[in-house]
Swiss-Prot record:
Native organism: Schizosaccharomyces pombe (strain 972 / ATCC 24843)
Family that this chain belongs to: Belongs to the ATPase d subunit family.
GO-annotated biological processes: proton motive force-driven ATP synthesis; proton motive force-driven mitochondrial ATP synthesis
Modified residues (N-acetylserine): 2
Protein name: ATP synthase subunit d, mitochondrial
Compartment(s) where it occurs, according to its Swiss-Prot or TrEMBL record: Mitochondrion inner membrane
GO molecular function terms listed in the Swiss-Prot or TrEMBL record: proton transmembrane transporter activity; structural molecule activity
Length: 175
């Protein structure tokens, strides 16, 4: 991994990524699992790189009485060729995971875009709204025609309190 990619990976606050991007639980757990497997692989690679890879057969020949065994082992090591592993199945699994993660990311992008549009429209409405001091009763009647009927019904029944007002805002009466 390049130094830039490594530094970028360390700079990310992975704990808050899921909440900030509003990822679903499956995507967040998949990212966490991938990060833990990556950390294990990096640790294993570090330990393997620290190990010595050469064998001093001359030392073993001088120490051991049976030099034939040392010769066999040396010839076996020289003739050793690592097994080539077909990585296609693993690459397919990685590609499938990547496709699923990409699909999840695209869904999240669409959700965020929709939410941003909704919030932008709401903000625009708030910015363009008249102050409440400038709104008249006639404006209210035009905006919500049924309000006049509701108020008339409340007045004829002698109800002077809006239902739910006290529960929401408390009782402001002094007496």
């Amino acid at each position: 991994m390049s130094k830039v990619a490594s530094a970028a990976g360390k700079a990310i606050d992975w704990a808050s990524v899921a909440s900030k991007l509003k990822l679903d639980a499956a995507t967040a757990s998949a990212i966490a699992n991938f990060r833990s497997r990556h950390a294990q692989a990096v640790a294993k690679l570090g330990t393997l790189r620290e190990q010595a890879t050469t064998v001093d057969f001359a030392t073993y020949r001088s120490v051991l009485a049976n030099k034939e065994i040392v010769n066999r082992i040396e010839s076996s090591m020289k003739s050793f060729k690592p097994v080539k592993i077909d990585l296609n199945s693993q690459l397919k699994a990685i590609n499938a995971f990547e496709a699923k993660a990409s699909e999840g990311a695209k869904k999240n992008v669409e959700l965020v875009k929709a939410e941003l549009q909704n919030l932008s429209a709401t903000l625009k409405n708030i910015e363009q709204a008249r102050p409440t001091e400038e709104i008249t009763i006639e404006d209210m009647k035009q905006a919500v025609p049924e309000i006049e009927k509701i108020v008339e019904t409340m007045v004829t029944k002698g109800k002077w309190v809006i239902p739910g007002y006290r529960e929401k805002f408390g009782d402001l009466s002094i007496m």
